[in-house]
């Protein structure tokens, strides 16, 4: 397995992360990227994204509040990413409730590129064609067969797939990881999943093994959440403490404290 200095390599490069994300959590995504050591750019105008992707280190597309303009921008951005060898992270927020989002994902896979799909367990199982329980953008799924869903979807799109829940699951279609860190308080802060998607983009920007980089991003969020909860047990103060702890997180800490089972 590749040397696991994922965070160190990311911070040495300060990667430019181009985000086309939802309006609910755009500020949170920008701030957590800055705290993590990356440089965020929240550029979504469809007549600007093609050129901007070409100078970016990674592209993060979040489908949470998908408008027609964002849809056009997302497809153009994914084409530019393919042409300029820029890794792409997709967060299919709410895809079981709004089927148009699946069409957008398939279009990006057809004409552009997808390197990582990161969603909650309900979203990932839905995309994999498995039975799942969701309510709006939230998963009600207990995680059964989640790694199988990740593996199937990874093979379908030839990418890394991560499914988040009480446990988190990552697969590249052959290898996998199961992560057992985290705190329930992460579910009480809107945008925790969106922020995680941004971290996945940051860690994959300059790291070849994207199964490892995605696992590192999830560990970073979960362990920062655990540490934040030690200091702040209420949602507002927890949110601030989470960003503070992302700023202080390190490779040594995530791999020593991380409860990861490699498959």
From Swiss-Prot:
Gene3D superfamilies: 3.40.1190.20. InterPro entries: Hyethyz_kinase (IPR000417), Ribokinase-like (IPR029056). ATP binds at residues 118, 164. Its EC number is 2.7.1.50. Pathway: Cofactor biosynthesis; thiamine diphosphate biosynthesis; 4-methyl-5-(2-phosphoethyl)-thiazole from 5-(2-hydroxyethyl)-4-methylthiazole: step 1/1. It is an enzyme of class 2 (transferase). Its cofactor is Mg(2+). Substrate binds at residues 42, 191. GO terms for biological process: thiamine biosynthetic process; thiamine diphosphate biosynthetic process. It catalyses: 5-(2-hydroxyethyl)-4-methylthiazole + ATP = 4-methyl-5-(2-phosphooxyethyl)-thiazole + ADP + H(+). One of its GO terms (molecular function) is hydroxyethylthiazole kinase activity. SUPFAM superfamilies: Ribokinase-like. Keywords: ATP-binding, Kinase, Magnesium, Metal-binding, Nucleotide-binding, Thiamine biosynthesis, Transferase. HAMAP family: Thz_kinase. Belongs to the Thz kinase family. Catalyzes the phosphorylation of the hydroxyl group of 4-methyl-5-beta-hydroxyethylthiazole (THZ). This is Hydroxyethylthiazole kinase 1.
């Amino acid at each position: 397995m590749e040397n696991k200095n994922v965070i160190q390599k990311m911070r040495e490069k300060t990667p430019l992360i181009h985000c086309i994300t939802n309006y609910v959590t755009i500020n949170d995504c920008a701030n957590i990227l800055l705290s993590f050591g990356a440089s965020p750019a929240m550029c979504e105008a469809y007549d600007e994204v093609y050129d901007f992707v070409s100078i970016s280190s990674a592209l993060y597309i979040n489908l949470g509040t998908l408008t027609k303009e964002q849809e056009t921008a997302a497809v153009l951005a994914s084409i530019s990413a393919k042409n300029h060898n820029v890794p792409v992270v997709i967060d299919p927020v709410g895809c079981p409730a709004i089927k148009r989002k699946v069409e957008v994902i398939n279009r990006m896979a057809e004409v552009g590129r997808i390197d990582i799909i990161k969603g909650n367990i309900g979203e990932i199982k839905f995309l994999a064609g498995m039975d799942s329980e969701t309510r709006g953008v939230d998963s009600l799924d207990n995680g059964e067969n989640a790694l199988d869903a990740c593996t199937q979807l990874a093979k379908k799109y030839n990418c890394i797939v991560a499914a988040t829940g009480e446990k988190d699951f990552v697969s590249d279609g052959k290898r996998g990881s199961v992560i057992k860190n985290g705190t329930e308080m992460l579910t009480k802060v809107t945008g925790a999943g969106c922020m995680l998607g941004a971290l996945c983009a940051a860690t994959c920007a300059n790291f070849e093994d994207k199964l490892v980089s995605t696992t590192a991003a999830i560990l970073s969020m979960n362990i920062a959440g655990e540490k934040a909860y030690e200091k702040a047990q209420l949602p507002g103060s927890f949110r601030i403490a989470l960003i503070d702890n992302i700023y202080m997180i390190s490779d040594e800490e995530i791999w020593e404290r991380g409860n990861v089972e490699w498959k």
